[in-house]
Amino acid sequence: QINADPNIPEERKMIFSVSKIFKKDFEGLAIYEKSDGEGSIVVSVQGSNGYALIDRASLKLKSFVTIIDGPEVDGTSDTDGIEVSNLSTSKYKKGILVVQDGFNDDGYQNFKIIDWNKISK
């Protein structure tokens, strides 16, 4: 954790270290903000092919999710970048998580759009 205010002296704080879930190679970072200031920090953990949802206030791990193969779309792996939106739409009531999928059998990288409701439970 590093303060973003340049007028405050830098003081780094370890939040998570490499572990069974947090394997090396953290790649993407996004913030899901709720209207009350609460929300999640989402971290792409490329070494684990998954995504950590961390509580913004407590900095505690809320959940760790992976996106697996489904009947129509494959899962994700080797994610470099992510983004999240809390914008409500008719299809995605609480927003979306967009992840870059770095490996596919056909050789083409792509993006997956995930319903925030499905990963934030």
Residues covered by each model-derived region:
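Sequence/structural signature of beta-propeller domains
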Residues: 1-121
